[in-house]
């Protein structure tokens, strides 16, 4: 069984985010790897479970009253057959629990992470363009794909 709940276990959030492989994928070259950054992100954290085992976290950060940025962090050991189901569970949690003014979710994914781009498409996000040369990865400025999903488009 897959479920999602609000996370107040910041130690687990930091464990996921500070993992070397995860950090390399989600941070740009200029961001100092410091666990206190998680406390400063100003977002709502969700914790994902598969068969009651913690299996990832999600950050939701309002960029306006109508839009939230979402990032799903699934540790490498938990990726695979349940990844898409985790994504759908997260989206359904947002649809069921978000404030009434939230109408859309956005995310930006570096173009080098084809697996994450496929994941975003697989759970319903639509490509809305590019944020050109917007993140420094491995010493090179690269593009990010901009994805969006209206709350009304979330499939239950």
Region spans (language model):
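Conserved beta-strand in the GNAT
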Residues: 47, 53-61, 68-69
